[in-house]
Amino acid sequence: MKLGIINGWDEASFRYVAELGLHAVEFCCNHNYDSMEVAGHTDEIKAFGERYGVAVGSIGRWGQKRIDEQGEIIPSALRHDQNLIDAASALGCPVYNVGCNWTEGKTFEENCEIAIRYFGTLIDYAKGKNVRIAVYNCSWENFVVTEKEWTPILGALPDLGLKYDTSHCLGRGGDYLREMVAWGSRIYHFHIKGSLYVDGRHYDDPPAGLDQINWGTVMTVLYNSHYNGMLSIEPHSNHWMGTRGQWGVEYTIKFITPLIMPEDYTYNGSPYMP
């Protein structure tokens, strides 16, 4: 596994990530950005990565409405996703994260079929580009967020994976460890985002390690699921900005790093067990 962080795609962002001692960055080219801001500058972005030793580990587009009121694919939304899949391919980025919005007036089964059609279109487009498609478990213009939706949709699309974030499951009152154990083999990308609930209410998303997520157990499930992708730090709190926010990012790096087995770690044999 490789620890990285969400950040921008300009040179200053790559420099910042490298100064943190990290070697991977995630781009969130959300609905409020034109996809060509990334897709139109891949040569430049690739040069930044080589200069600072930082790989692009994930690209995603959150908040994009992809399906219209009739349940049809919105062509411009599809084009944005295709542009970013092309960008991921050009940058050597292994995963692209998407969602699919709910269509009012359609049944659950019909919405699942719409999502299968949309995700299937992206999977077909990504073939031969070394990019895998993952659906995020955030509900921002996306209804494919729990096992109820994953069972029919991922069941129909064996190449579709998950971008998993424990905080979203916690926010829905779910059991993130149960979800991870059941679906760990389908996790293509993973967010490191702290979350804290008090008396059943959301209190804050503090830096990971200063929150209530059991990160050691989370890592055990990822290891047992043979996950070997990016662990992407997501700062996500207005209480943790400025100097304290930066300290929080650095704290999370120091907290998570010892949980990651080094890539060059070797041992001849196996620990004794009676």
What are these regions (language model features)?
Residues 1-3, 7-23, 77, 92, ...:
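Histidine-acidic metal/acid-base catalytic patches
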Residues 27, 57-60, 93-100, 133-136, ...:
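Short beta-strand segments at enzyme active-site cores
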Residues 1-2, 57-68, 102:
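N-terminal small/glycine-rich loop or linker at the start of catalytic domains
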Residues 1-10, 31-32, 38-45, 76-80:
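N-terminal-biased segments
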Residues 9-11, 29-31, 62-65, 100-104, ...:
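Active-site-proximal loop/turn and secondary-structure-junction residues that shape catalytic pockets
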Residues 41-52, 117-126, 179, 217-222:
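Catalytic-core regions built around general acid/base machinery
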Residues 26-49, 100-107:
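Glycine-rich, proline-tolerant flexible connector loops at the mouths of alpha/beta enzymes
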Residues 19, 50-51, 67-161, 171, ...:
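Active-site acidic/histidine proton-transfer and metal-coordination neighborhood
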